[in-house]
């Protein structure tokens, strides 16, 4: 047996049929079809290798390329065998190469069965140690098999002359080209993976830088943070685009880069959370900004309040200075009275403000031991009592001024601490008004009527000493001697001086207070109206009292009727409390006064009632022509303004004006005593008047003596009744 496949002999299995065996030499001709078939198969294998290289990556493409090369090397043998079989079928005769074809067909399975082995060898052995082609592998296996067959029983086998082998194909070069292409494709796949990973790394760095830029504005000012925060819509679009890019990268990147995609997802989640925190911080900053703006607007109101408090403080200081100056004047006058007193041996003041000659005569009489007249002693006692009462009253005034001073200081302290000082200053003004009224009631006539208290809530004078009034009545009796008359004249002169000085002080003081309170302004206007006539002098006897009063009341105007209505229009009253609206205040006033609800009073109805009443008075013709129904008391709709003043006060003021006119025309004001009942009976009915009359009977004092009409009266003679 031959030990090498290059020998010219081969073995053929003898079949059941005895075939003629011919020993032939090597064929000089090779079938062209068998040569073209391997080349076509090689070309197809190369094309298949290129297509597989486009879809697979790296090492798998290289492995498949090598396996396809092995299969391509085996396919020429199969094609050659098929060509031989085709030739047999076509011609129906056997050619000399039939035995060779059969041998090739028998040997082809061996080659195909060696395919897996070659694949295993390629995996375990370096490519440089592999054979150049599968044909070489087949030759090696052929040699080994022929060597093994030498030991096997060759019975039934016949040896024949084989054909000359065809020249070897240049498979090595093709294999080198395929390997180079596979390596290039693998390198391309590796480079794509590296590009994907690099893009992911760059994207991650960009996101980190972007998130760092968003976190920086937390320590910057509010304005910069607001400028760097992106709008919500743009942020959502950016996040959505990045998520789409990440999904595309996940679909295109191999599974080896999955951990990097997970880290990118975590980064995106972190970025979304940070964006939410940024939006929350932005909302908080906006709220704080609005709060700061509101706080910036508040100082404006505080500045206005501080300005008002400063004005009130300044007014309090001026009033305090006025009180101090008045106190100093009182002290000076008291010292002057004590200095003008001429005392006797027993220390009793014998003469107040007497002339030096009279004082010397009295002193000489005292030294001579002559006893004074009994009437003179009585007068001295009375004067001493009056002086004592005056000292007591001055002491009370001193205490009152001290309390006012303390209250003023406390009010100024409260105003300095930011508390509203209007209430304290109003109370202080009220006390000062009472002080002035007390001074008027003491006999120190300042030329002012008791109606000045109307601006300070219509309070009655506090300081009225009965002993002083009795002393003044005794002076008016005219049963005094020459010295008493002389003392009286001196006292009246000193009273005039005090009146002038106090009038000036009161005018200055009222001028300060009327800037803050409209009622004080009203009071000051009345006081100025009283001072219009410079010819007015203080009364010196009871007979001249009426003329002085009328002159002081009407002034230079010769039409007292119109002046009365004008005085009525100047008056202002305290508005009703505890109600809102015209109808509500009218109803509340009716229930409080008569227990009957009062409908809002109309201007036409009240005018008709007034004309009806004035028609009964023969002297009230001028008053009927000009009724005091101005817009100050009635609105545009003709309804009485119950929410600004009470209807009862308005009726009382009308009655006071009518009493003044009646006193001027007839000398008696009893003719208009039924005016109030006439008006109320029209609006409330007779039942309400009866109920009111029952209430009057239960009262132990005279209603007219203390009613609001007496408080509003401008004549001081009301205080001297009884």
Curated annotation (Swiss-Prot):
Any GO MF annotation of the entry: DNA-binding transcription factor binding
Location of motif Nuclear localization signal in this chain is 482-502, 686-711
Q: Which InterPro entries match?
A: CCPG1/PBIP1
Entry-annotated residues carrying Phosphoserine? 133, 144-146, 166, 559
List localization entries.
Cytoplasm, Cytoskeleton; Nucleus
Q: Subunit arrangement? A: Interacts with ESR1, PBX1, PBX2 and PBX3. Interacts with TEX11.
State its role: Regulator of pre-B-cell leukemia transcription factors (BPXs) function. Inhibits the binding of PBX1-HOX complex to DNA and blocks the transcriptional activity of E2A-PBX1. Tethers estrogen receptor-alpha (ESR1) to microtubules and allows them to influence estrogen receptors-alpha signaling.
Name of the protein described by the UniProt record:
Pre-B-cell leukemia transcription factor-interacting protein 1
Species whose genome carries this gene = Rattus norvegicus
């Amino acid at each position: 047996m031959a030990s090498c496949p290059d020998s010219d002999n081969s073995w053929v299995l003898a079949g059941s049929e005895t075939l003629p065996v011919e020993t032939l030499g090597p064929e000089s001709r090779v079938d062209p079809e068998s040569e073209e078939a391997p080349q076509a198969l090689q070309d197809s294998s190369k094309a298949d290798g290129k297509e597989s290289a486009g879809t697979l990556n790296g090492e798998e493409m290289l492995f498949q390329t090598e396996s396809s090369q092995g299969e391509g090397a085996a396919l020429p043998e199969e094609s050659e065998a098929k060509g031989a079989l085709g030739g047999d079928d076509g011609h129906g005769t056997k050619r000399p190469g039939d035995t060779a074809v059969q041998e090739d067909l028998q040997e082809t399975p061996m080659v195909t069965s060696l395919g897996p082995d070659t694949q295993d060898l390629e995996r375990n052995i370096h490519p440089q140690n592999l054979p150049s082609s599968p044909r070489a592998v087949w030759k090696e296996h052929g040699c080994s098999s022929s060597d093994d067959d030498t030991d096997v029983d060759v019975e039934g086998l016949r040896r024949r002359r084989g054909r000359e082998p065809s020249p070897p194909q240049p498979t090595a070069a093709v294999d080198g080209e395929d390997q180079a292409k596979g390596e290039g494709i693998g390198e391309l796949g590796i480079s794509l993976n590296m590009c994907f990973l690099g893009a992911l790394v760059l994207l991650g760095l960009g996101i980190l830088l972007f998130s760092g830029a968003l976190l920086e504005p937390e320590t910057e000012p509010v304005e910069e943070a607001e400028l760097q925060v992106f709008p919500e819509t743009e942020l959502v679009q950016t996040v959505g685009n990045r998520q789409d890019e990440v999904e595309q990268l996940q679909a295109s990147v191999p599974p080896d880069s999955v951990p990097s995609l997970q880290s990118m997802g975590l980064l995106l989640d972190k970025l979304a959370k940070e964006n939410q925190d940024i939006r929350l911080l932005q909302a908080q900053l906006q709220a704080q900004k609005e709060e700061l703006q509101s706080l910036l607007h508040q100082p404006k109101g505080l500045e206005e309040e501080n300005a008002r408090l400063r004005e009130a403080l300044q007014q309090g200081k001026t009033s305090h200075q006025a009180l101090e100056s008045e106190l100093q004047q009182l002290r000076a006058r008291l010292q002057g009275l004590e200095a003008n007193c001429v005392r006797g041996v027993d220390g009793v003041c014998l003469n107040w403000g007497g002339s030096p000659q009279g004082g010397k005569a009295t002193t000489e009489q005292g030294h001579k031991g002559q006893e004074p007249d009994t009437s003179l002693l009585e007068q001295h006692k009375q004067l001493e009592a009056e002086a004592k009462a005056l000292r007591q009253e001055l002491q009370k005034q001193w205490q009152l001024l001290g309390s006012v001073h303390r209250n003023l200081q406390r009010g100024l302290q409260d105003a300095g601490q930011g508390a509203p000082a209007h209430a304290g200053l109003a109370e202080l003004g009220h006390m000062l008004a009472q002080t002035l009224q007390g001074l008027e009631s003491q006999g120190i006539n300042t030329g002012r009527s008791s109606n000045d208290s109307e601006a300070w809530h219509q309070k009655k004078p506090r300081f009225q000493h009965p002993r002083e009034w009795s002393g003044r009545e005794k002076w008016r009796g005219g049963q005094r001697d020459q010295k008493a008359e002389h003392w009286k004249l001196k006292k009246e002169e000193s009273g005039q001086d005090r009146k002038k000085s106090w009038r000036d002080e009161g005018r200055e003081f009222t001028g300060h207070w009327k800037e803050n309170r409209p009622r004080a302004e009203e009071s000051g206007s009345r006081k100025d109206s009283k001072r219009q006539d410079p010819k007015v002098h203080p009364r010196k006897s009871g007979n001249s009292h009426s003329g002085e009063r009328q002159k002081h009341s009407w002034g230079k105007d010769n039409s007292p009727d119109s002046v009365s209505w004008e005085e009525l229009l100047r008056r202002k009253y305290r508005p009703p409390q505890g109600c809102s609206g015209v109808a509500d205040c009218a109803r509340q006033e009716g229930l409080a006064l008569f227990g009957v609800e009062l409908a809002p009073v109309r201007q036409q109805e009240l005018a008709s009632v007034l004309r009806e009443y004035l028609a009964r008075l023969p002297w009230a013709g001028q008053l009927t022509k000009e009724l005091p129904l101005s817009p100050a008391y009635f609105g545009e709709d003709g309804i009485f303004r119950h929410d600004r003043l009470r209807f009862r006060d308005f009726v009382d003021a009308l009655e006071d004006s009518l009493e003044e006119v009646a006193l001027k025309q007839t000398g008696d004001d009893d003719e208009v005593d039924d005016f109030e009942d006439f008006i109320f009976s029209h609006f409330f009915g007779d039942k309400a008047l009866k109920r009111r009359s029952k209430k009057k009977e239960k009262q132990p004092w005279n209603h007219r003596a203390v009613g609001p009409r007496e408080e509003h009266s401008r004549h001081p003679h009301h205080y001297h009744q009884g």
